[in-house]
Every structure is written in C-alpha cells, then in structure tokens.
C-alpha cells in the first residue's frame, strides 16, 4: 500500500504556468511520462493548453506541445451554463488558444500505425480534436473537429479494446451556450484506425433512451466493454458490449436506476476492473448538487459490479434494491463518511491494491463562513480486497485547496498523482483573512511509492 512518507512532488505551481489548474490526462510513452493540462478558461495566450513530458531519470519537465492560437469569435465568448454572469472574456488581442485542455490520453496501435502511438483528446470551443504522436515530440491533428460535429467540446476516455479505440463526447457548444458536462451526442465512438481519422458510432444515442444524456466512462472487463451513463431522471446506467461485428454494436443493460439510489447516483464518474469485478464510482458536480436538474445534495458511492450482473454496495447509503437489502460492505456511508466527497474522480490498481480518489469541496465551508480556518482537500483510499479501505490521505496531502485528483497512473517509478487546484479560492480565502500563500497556485504532480510491490497495474480512463 502507498506510504505517504515516500511522497515526492515532481511538479507544482502549474509546472511553469500557475494558470494550468488541472492535471487532466496522463500516460507513459516510450519510458517517459506525458501530462495533458487544462485551464478553466481560454482567455488568451497564457491559457494555451500544454502537453508536458517528464523524464524520470533526469527529473525534469519539457513542454512538447502547446495549443496554437486563433482569432476570437462568438464561440470564444460562449456563456457557460454552469457559471453565473455569462461566458469567457477575451483579454488578449493576440488571440485565444484553440485548446484550453487535453482531456484524454492513451497509447494505442491502430491499423495503419507502424508502432504504438500516443493519442490525445483536446478541449476546444471549435470542436474537440484527436492528436497523435509517434515520437512524443510532434503532435498532429488526426480527426475532424468534434469527429464531424464541431459542436462537441471534447472527448473523455480514450479506451483500447479488442484492437479498437473507443471514446465518448463530453461538453457541447451551441447557440452561444457552453455546457461542460452534458452533450448533444451521448454516443460511443469507435475506430480501428484513428491515425486516418476514421470513426464510427458504436452505439445508439443514449443506448436508445433519451434520459441517458451523457456517457461518462468506458472500461473493459473480460470479454465486454462497459459504459457508464449520466441519467439525471432515473440514475446512472451501466451497459456493455462484446464489440463484435460491424458498428453500431449490440449492447445490453446490466445495471440501472443508480443501483437503487436513483438520481442521487446520477452519473458514473470512474470505473476500473479489480479482481474480476468492475468498480464504479459515482458523483454529482461541484458541491454535490445539480441545480439545473434539482438533484442533491449527495456524496459519492462506490459500487462493485460482477460479470453476472449482481452488484455490491461498498461505500454508500443502506437501502433496499431489486437485489434485496444493500448494506455498505466497507461499513462507510456516502463519500467515505464525508459528505464533501461529492465525486469519485479517479481509480486505479497499483501493485495489487485498489486506489480510489475523490473530489472534495470542503474548502467552500470556510469561504461560506462555516469554519474558522480553511480545511479540506481530496481523499485517497486504498483496499487490497475491495471491501476494507484504509485512508492514504484525507486532506489533499496537506493542501486544502487541492480539491481533487484527476490523474492516477501506475508506473515502475511509483504511482503518479495529479491534482485539480482551485487557485482562485486561495485569493478568496486570503481576502477573508486566512493565512494563505496565494502564490501556491496551479496543479501539482507527485510520485508515491508502495514498499511491497506485487500485482499487475491497471488504471481507469480519464475524463
């Protein structure tokens, strides 16, 4: 299990740009670590998203790709529906970045790839793109904007399965409005040759149900690829396919109604295979409330789904379900007994141990005057059997403003941990009299060791 005493920060303060807030995607390629960073806005050259490379031996970072700039137009000013007061303000005449983030990243060898290549999905108001690199130095665009629909803001997980690459769109921009978490195309896409930009729809929209408004996560388990939806009316659903024949494939539903919690389990935020079962982390955005759909407040749950369709409640709210009485096997209520853990954002398997990382909004309690001093920070919990969980950290490794974990990547050098840092909250806390170093802004990346390695590493997809 991870030993917090071995934690080493290998990147901080946004790694050269404190406006780089989210360590959004990550992969090991040709022995080096690649990191895609995201900015909450794209107001000028200072918000151009970057892909960085870390050399484990030298211990240094290199910027290998920076988003190009483009002239600002109406899409640059799109009103963000999640934020009061409208959309983004362009502050530079030099232009705005085409990409303000890189959301998905994986190593994959398609039909025309001579060797495995690094594929990256972008966040762009002009339609998310897929980038490809064969050497980790040059990145080329290998897709149409939005895979043919430039209203699609980005793509979440890039998941290899049975020689094909799968992804799902997230975010939409239409009629001057930006929706970061929804989509106008809740569909799984597939390609056996992404280098040629050839993509097909692998599913019906919403799997045939319009209430499945978004497909958040994909993960393989055995002979099936599983997909987790967001369904604000009835609760998340889990679907699976063997991906046989020509797309769109045949899919079957294996879990619905938010595993019996209905809309309080509106969305699947993370999935990973561990010891022959699929582990599912749920969540609601922000402070655990979706005001647009009048859902919440609620904290995240952790659920274990078996290949036969039966499920176990591990962390969550006791209840009766179609499977009978469900009592959390970890003996912990939603959010690992912490109501501020609104989302399970990342999971991975490293050295035979399951790691679960959260989004924690506790810092807002201070900003709302509910606590005397800033407190909070993401949680990481660990389990060797999927039922008995031990905390690795419950305070963001001492940083209350590190609200969440966006990357968990097992490597031979340790577990890579990348954060989502709300630097603007540091400014607000300082204005309210807190003893806060406002210069400590921007994402951070750390390596943490397990002194007793064993088992095969697996990571959940990004998004």
Kindly label every feature range from the protein language model.
Residues 231, 284, 360:
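A structured beta-alpha segment of the ubiquitous adenosine-cofactor-binding alpha/beta core
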Residues 1-21, 28, 32, 40-103, ...:
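Trp- and S/T/G-rich repeat-edge/linker motifs of beta-rich repeat architectures
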């Amino acid at each position: 299990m991870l030993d917090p005493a071995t934690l080493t920060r290998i990147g901080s303060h946004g790694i050269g740009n404190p406006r780089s807030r989210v360590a959004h995607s990550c992969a090991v390629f040709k022995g080096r670590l690649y990191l895609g960073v995201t900015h909450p806005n794209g107001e000028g050259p200072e918000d151009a998203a970057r892909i960085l490379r870390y050399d484990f031996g030298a211990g240094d970072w290199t910027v290998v790709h920076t988003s190009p700039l483009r002239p600002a137009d109406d899409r640059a000013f799109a009103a963000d529906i999640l934020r009061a007061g409208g959309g983004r303000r362009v502050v530079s005449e030099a232009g705005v970045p085409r990409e303000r983030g890189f959301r998905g990243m994986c190593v994959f060898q398609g039909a025309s790839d001579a060797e495995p290549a690094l594929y990256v999905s972008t966040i762009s108001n002009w339609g998310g793109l897929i980038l490809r690199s064969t050497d980790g130095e040059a990145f080329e665009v290998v897709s149409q904007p939005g895979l043919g629909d430039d209203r699609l803001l980005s793509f979440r997980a890039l998941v290899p399965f049975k020689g094909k690459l799968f992804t799902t769109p997230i975010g939409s921009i239409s009629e001057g409005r930006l929706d970061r978490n929804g989509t106008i195309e809740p569909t799984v896409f597939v390609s056996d040759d992404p280098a040629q930009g050839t993509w097909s729809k692998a599913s019906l929209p919403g799997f045939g149900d319009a209430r499945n408004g978004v497909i958040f996560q994909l993960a393989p388990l055995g002979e099936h690829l599983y997909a987790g939806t967001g369904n604000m009316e009835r609760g998340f659903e889990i679907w699976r396919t063997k991906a046989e024949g020509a797309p769109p494939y045949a899919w079957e539903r294996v879990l619905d109604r938010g595993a019996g919690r209905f809309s309080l389990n509106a969305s699947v935020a993370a999935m990973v295979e561990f010891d022959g079962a699929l582990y599912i982390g749920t969540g609601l955005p922000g402070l655990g409330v979706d005001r647009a759909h009048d859902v919440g407040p609620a904290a995240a749950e952790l659920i274990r789904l078996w290949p036969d369709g039966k499920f176990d409640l591990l962390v969550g709210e006791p209840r009766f379900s179609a499977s009978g009485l469900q009592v959390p096997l970890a003996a912990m209520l939603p959010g690992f007994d912490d109501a501020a853990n609104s989302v399970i954002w990342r999971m991975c398997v490293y050295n035979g141990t399951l790691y679960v990382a959260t989004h924690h909004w506790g810092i807002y309690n201070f900003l709302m005057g509910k606590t005397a001093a800033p407190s909070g920070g993401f949680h990481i919990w660990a389990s060797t059997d999927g039922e008995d969980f031990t905390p690795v950290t419950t305070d963001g490794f001492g940083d209350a403003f590190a609200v969440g974990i966006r990357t968990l990547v097992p490597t031979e050098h340790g577990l890579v941990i990348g954060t989502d840092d709300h630097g603007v909250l540091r400014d607000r806390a300082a204005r309210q009299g807190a003893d806060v170093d406002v210069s400590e802004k921007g994402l951070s990346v750390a390596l943490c060791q397990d002194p007793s390695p064993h088992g095969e590493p697996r990571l959940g997809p990004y998004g």
